[in-house]
Amino acid sequence: MAAHSGGAFPLARRARTALRRVPVWTWRLMMRSVSSRERVRFNTDPVTEVAYVHDLDYVGDGLRAHRLDVQTPLSVAQTSAEGAVARGGSLPVYVYFHGGGWTSGDKSALTKYCANQALGGMVVVNVNYRHAPRFHMGHVLEDANAALAWVVANIKEYGGDPARLILGGDSAGGQISALLTAISRRPELAAHYSLLPAVPAGHVKGLVQHCSAVDFSVFFESGFVLSLNFVRMLLPATAPLTPARLKSAAGYLSPIEWLDGSHPPVFVTTSERDFFYRSNLNFIARLQDHGVPVDALVYPWASANTEHTWQQDYRYPESQEVYRRLHAFVGNVAGPPAGAD
């Protein structure tokens, strides 16, 4: 099957022949050029065995950045929520955050990806959030936490179990979901972002990471593709930081720094073609150091389809393998509904 050639990261690789590192403004232009094409390509031949509810406002301010979609297997959607819960039939909930370098992207490009996961026996919540550089990481995590609060309050109506959550995302969205998982377990990180976690730590049963930015130390390595302004834009506006202070501040953006033995199991997918390959390998190793169960699917360079965030494109056999492994992962970590025999 033909290699993935339409995404922003192959463009970024080519741009690096002219630029030592890709700056934020160049990234935003590249994303603008590919986003509409990705939305069409990734959603060809919609999944019909899933019920779709689009653009639910999880904050109440009418912003598109504060909308989410819910996708439920038809077998559950056609049954009243009360009946499903009474039979102990509520499903685990997979809450997903899209990527886009924190500056771009939209949940609409992930509709079919999310539907394919719903087919695996889960309710899927597909979340938008505010983007940098207008908003910093504190705002993004505030949105993500608000989305979880909405899930806790409302997901039973869609057949989901708010006590069996799996968080996930790709690229920047993976970093958001990983930080949110850490915030549920690390009070000092929650305090840093002035957040009261919307979900008890024990209700987050697992974490899914697709080509995620989980170790920010790679931004400071020679030859990394993205400029340090990606780090700066995620921090609150301050006087310019020295390199040492910028690296210290990046620790609060870097999920790897907040891992411990209490972390839930993780499913990681990456490849040697992924710009965050080293970041993901470091994350896997740190999880293993802490004794956290981790299922890692890592493709070699020879797998030409596996450019950064290939998982969104259902046409690739490598994506189908991700989906099979993800379904099994959720089934293994979610556990039975409360009160089930």
Q: For the regions a protein language model found, what residue spans apply to each?
A:
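Alpha/beta-hydrolase superfamily serine-hydrolase fold, recognizing
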Residues: A2-D341
